[in-house]
Amino acid sequence: MQLSGRRVICVRGGREVFAGLDFEAVSGEAVAVVGRNGSGKTSLLRLIAGLLIPAGGTIALDGGDAELTLPEQCHYLGHRDALKPALSVAENLSFWADFLGGERLDAHESLATVGLDHATHLPAAFLSAGQRRRLSLARLLTVRRPIWLLDEPTTALDVAGQDMFGGLMRDHLARGGLIIAATHMALGIDSRELRIGGVA
């Protein structure tokens, strides 16, 4: 599987964010997108996820599931946790599994993996920032998708949480998955750098 972009142009609010961007990533590879604030790191992830439309150029997936669109093969995890505060941990995860569709895996096992199996009944409003991030990460495990698009994925995670997530990413890559992450911090796994907008 290979994800590639050729001469990609991103325009937001009438402003050109970047132009002529080329990139590629293959199965088993992690790419860390780096650059200054406002250089377009998040915009690139949103373009790949189908949440924005390129103003020019192409983004294509070769070797994925031919019956699914590129966005349908992507997990997009934004820098905000996208949780409903009044819903419990289990209910939030169930909501996302229903919304995403596709092959659904064991939710309790996903919560156990991220260290939240003891808190399934708690409303998300009662979780710490680190716990909310762990719950967001559990989405990646509950519905199987080969491409993970991650925006500042380790935000609010303590050292133990970062180590846990590093293990999840390595497992995903070992199964032939692909990761593109916009980050200001080291991912904690082997990755190739894609720099946007000159020196960060």
Swiss-Prot record:
Subcellular location as annotated: Cell inner membrane
Keyword Metal-binding among record annotations: no
Cellular component, GO annotation: plasma membrane
Annotated positions binding ATP: 35-42
Record membrane topology: Peripheral membrane protein
Reactions listed under catalytic activity: heme b(in) + ATP + H2O = heme b(out) + ADP + phosphate + H(+)
Entry's EC annotation: 7.6.2.5
PROSITE patterns assigned: ABC_TRANSPORTER_1, ABC_TRANSPORTER_2, CCMA
InterPro entries: AAA+_ATPase, ABC_transporter-like_ATP-bd, ABC_transporter-like_CS, ABC_transptr_haem_export_CcmA, P-loop_NTPase
Keywords per UniProt: ATP-binding, Cell inner membrane, Cell membrane, Cytochrome c-type biogenesis, Membrane, Nucleotide-binding, Translocase, Transport
Single Gene Ontology BP annotation: cytochrome complex assembly
Name under which the protein is recorded: Cytochrome c biogenesis ATP-binding export protein CcmA
Native organism: Bradyrhizobium diazoefficiens (strain JCM 10833 / BCRC 13528 / IAM 13628 / NBRC 14792 / USDA 110)
